[in-house]
Design a protein with these regions (language model features):
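Oligomerization/assembly interface segments of phage tail-like spikes and tubes
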Residues: 66-90, 154-167
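Mixed-charge, glycine-accented linear interaction segment located at domain edges/termini
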Residues: 136-215
Length: 230
């Protein structure tokens, strides 16, 4: 799908049953956290969210001196996210770290699962498009710390990689796409599908899809950009 721009990114932590963690166990009181551009929330928005491996590898099957079939493997998406800044507490929780009594963030044993929605817009109509991943893990492969100079500052962005896993509500497929212009698309259901159990309700959730649906930007059930306690 031809899209333009990166409007925002939503994330949440999941428990072993696939439900969204909320409050002190999650990323916000509602469970859903928006990586917005509000400095008061510790965020500076995101530059890119590059999605790869949306299709599995293909293997030709030959017989009688001709190609008789093609086998297609399952998709194994990864998303590389480049954010200018993510709230530090949220960042640590996404990476599966827990805080000690002394304040240190230490990697936990096992895997911390999360979910992800990337919101963009269709290139021609400007209607919203959501790339959704109901289950996966976030990792950070490196941290490049450089000195400032007498003429320039050298900040490093928050760079994350999301590796998608099979999601049972989608027949164990790894991703889904929603388009605002589709009459069947209900904004509330997009978030219910990806973040089940969350109290977060995007603005416009009562609209039953379609081109006139208002744009989400708030929560009736809890802030999407106030980190939960720890």
């Amino acid at each position: 799908m031809a899209v333009r721009g990166l409007k925002t990114i939503y994330v949440a932590l999941k428990d072993a049953s696939g439900q969204t963690l909320m409050g002190k166990d999650g990323l916000s009181e509602s469970g859903v956290y928006e990586i917005d551009t509000n400095k008061a929330n510790g965020n500076l928005g995101s530059r890119t969210a590059n999605i790869s491996n949306l299709a599995g590898s293909t293997t030709k099957v030959s017989g009688n001196n001709q190609v008789v079939d093609v086998e297609v493997g399952d998709a194994a998406p990864t998303v590389t996210i480049d954010s200018n800044a993510i709230n530090p507490t949220v960042m640590q929780k996404l990476l599966g770290r827990e805080q000690s009594a002394s304040g240190a963030w230490i990697p936990k044993d096992g895997v911390t699962e999360s979910a992800l929605i990337i919101e963009t817009q269709e290139r021609v109509t400007g209607q919203r498009v959501w790339f959704a991943f109901g289950r996966g893990i976030m990792t950070q492969s490196s941290q490049n710390v450089q000195t400032d100079t007498d003429t320039a500052k050298t900040p490093e962005d928050d760079n994350l990689t999301f590796t998608a896993e099979g999601y049972q509500p989608w027949n164990n497929k790894t991703f889904a796409t929603y388009y605002e212009g589709d009459a069947k698309t209900n904004i509330a259901n997009v978030f219910k599908d990806v973040f089940p159990g969350s109290s977060f309700t995007p603005a416009g959730a009562t609209t039953q899809g379609g081109a006139g649906a208002p744009k989400p930007g708030g929560s009736a059930g809890g802030s999407a950009s106030q980190p939960g306690g720890h």
